[in-house]
From Swiss-Prot:
Residues 44-152 form the Rieske domain. Converts carnitine to trimethylamine and malic semialdehyde. Fe cation binds at residues 208, 213, 323. This is Carnitine monooxygenase oxygenase subunit. Disruption phenotype: Mutant cannot grow on carnitine as a sole carbon and energy source, whereas the growth on succinate is not affected. Mutation abolishes trimethylamine formation from carnitine. One of its GO terms (molecular function) is 2 iron, 2 sulfur cluster binding. It catalyses: (R)-carnitine + NADH + O2 + H(+) = (3R)-3-hydroxy-4-oxobutanoate + trimethylamine + NAD(+) + H2O; (R)-carnitine + NADPH + O2 + H(+) = (3R)-3-hydroxy-4-oxobutanoate + trimethylamine + NADP(+) + H2O. [2Fe-2S] cluster binds at residues 86, 88, 106, 109.
């Protein structure tokens, strides 16, 4: 890498005197290509809740750093992941999500594959000299169910998710005891014109909550709000109050808790006040200035109550657009001649509810991949 793309090993190591990345790290295609290979091709990436693949033949597809991935539960109930391309000539095999047939058929030349990825039939292969059926299967990648969610990893030498996020599953289950019962209730898909790190930076602080999220801020008790850092994950937690602008809570519950987890590299798990539902922000970087996001909302019941429907609409029409407008504006502003190139990370000694020390922790981790 060129000198402009390197960062010192101790970058943001001291959050009390920290500045953000130089702006090139948010805009450069060279930086993005490096991060794509050094970070995303070698990390566990969360792609969905386990309930989306609850039954045999269930499958989903995801696009991660330009790779089309299919995750499928076989007839044997085993979870598997593959690159979603035919080994013959590269045509994509499955689209969207749903229930697969007992074989996967390529739309191009009708090669068929069993749900374990092995080749079932290649038309005319008996008449093709030295055709290698064993080497014509779908190409697998690692997949793991962890903490009630599905993770994939393109690194064939990767160890388990727990090694990447030690202690996270236990803490998440403490925050939300109904994870295994959750079901997808809503998904907002956006191709956001912002670098993936801009989006994480925004999540890693509540300094902006008062000015930019008035409804959310009306429910959050900022004087009872903490942000703790762990190994490759952080936790923002505290106590809430009922608000007509956002969360309408049971008045008999004193100081209901909320939890917001960021996990390396860029998935955010939220347990709102009440602890009986979750929202998850899945980030799938596309290029230096574009990130595909799935904002998923999960409840335990399939037939939604009116309050739940109203809450979904609040997320859709109020809370979600507030964050999208913020990160899109930042991405534009970073390229201005009026931006001095780095911003001061506003960490206070008390590590209060509005302190930005979470950003410093995240940026220090990223810096280790830019030596």
């Amino acid at each position: 890498m060129s000198a402009v793309e390197k960062l010192p090993e101790d970058f943001c190591a001291n959050p009390d005197v920290a500045w953000t990345f130089p702006k090139v790290f948010y805009t450069s295609s060279q930086v993005f290509e490096h991060e794509k290979e050094a970070i995303f091709a070698k990390s566990w990436i969360c792609v969905a809740h386990s309930s989306e693949l609850a039954q045999p033949n269930d499958y989903i597809t995801r696009k991660v750093i330009g790779e089309n991935i299919v995750i499928i539960r076989g007839k044997d109930s085993v979870l598997r992941a593959f690159y979603n391309v035919c080994p013959h000539r590269g045509h994509e095999l499955l689209s969207g999500s749903g229930k697969a047939k007992n074989v996967i058929t390529c739309p191009y030349h009708a090669w068929t594959f069993k749900l374990d990825g092995s080749l079932a039939l290649a038309r005319n292969c008996d008449h093709v000299e030295s055709f290698d059926k064993e080497n014509s299967s779908m190409v697998p990648l690692k997949v793991e169910e962890y903490a009630g969610f599905l993770f994939i990893n393109m690194d064939e030498n990767a160890t388990c998710v727990e090694d990447q996020l030690p202690g996270f599953a236990e803490r998440l289950n403490q925050a939300c005891g109904v994870i295994k019962d959750l079901k997808l209730a809503a998904r907002f898909v956006t191709e956001t014109p912002a670098n993936w790190k801009v989006i994480v930076d925004n999540y890693m602080e509540c300094y902006h909550c008062g000015p930019a999220h008035p409804g959310f801020a009306d429910s959050v008790q900022v004087d009872k709000y903490w942000h703790t850092t762990h190994q490759n994950w952080t936790l923002q937690y505290g106590f809430a109050r009922s608000s007509e602008k956002s969360f309408k809570l049971d008045p008999s519950v004193t100081d209901p808790e909320f939890h917001g987890f960021w996990t390396w590299p860029c998935t955010m798990f939220n347990v709102p006040p009440g602890s009986n539902f979750m929202t998850v922000i899945y980030e799938f970087p596309v290029d230096a200035e574009t990130t595909l996001q799935h904002y998923d909302i999960y409840f335990t019941n399939e037939e939604l109550t009116q309050d739940q429907k109203d809450l979904i609409e609040w997320y859709r029409n109020v809370f979600r657009p507030e964050d999208l407008n913020l990160v899109e504006s930042v991405q534009r502003g970073l390229k201005s001649r009026g931006y001095r190139g780095q911003g001061r990370i506003m960490t206070d000694k008390q590590r209060s509810g509005i302190s930005e020390h979470g950003i410093a922790y995240f940026q220090h981790l990223v810096a280790q991949y830019h030596q």
